[in-house]
Amino acid sequence: MQSTTSPMPPLPATAATADEIAVIAGWVAAGYPTGSGCSPVCTSGRTWRGGNDGSPEMNPGMACIQCHQASDEGPRFSIAGTVYPTLHEPDLCDGAPPSSGAQVIITGADGRTLTLAPNAAGNFYSETRVAGPYRAKVVTSGGERTMTASQTSGDCNTCHSLAGANGAPGRIMLP
């Protein structure tokens, strides 16, 4: 975290503050004690109960593209996912609302950007094709959270699930 040649988090992410570094250093100095863990929480207190009715707010947290391909219904998204306020939110829980001011910014390999605003369920999606591999970040007035590696799958919730998969720590989270 404090390296001048290879800082963590890597650029273009925002550098850790001195207070954040002190917390990590204290944890390391204490011998990496195991935390008590965290239970999933539906921060919004709202759960989707509408089934597969075709609403843009349907099935937050679920793998959108996988479902649309399997059912052969609905739009053919190139990018789709859900933004949440915390890392471990259950499937079908509404995510970050539009009032969060969040924008999901996708930058294709060709340098073109696609900016998406999450809806009332936190869902974002687009049928616009993106040149891969692409980069992604979530931006608010309070900062940005950037993926550290380029991606090739636009089905964001496949990896950004309750527990996380394929190296993702959990949900797509607001900065």
Per-region residue spans from a language model:
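Short Cys/His-rich "knuckle" micro-motifs
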Residues: 74-77, 167-169
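Short, acidic Ser/Thr/Gly-rich low-complexity loop/linker segments typical of extracellular
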Residues: 109-121
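A short, solvent-exposed beta-strand micro-motif common in secreted/extracellular proteins
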Residues: 132-141
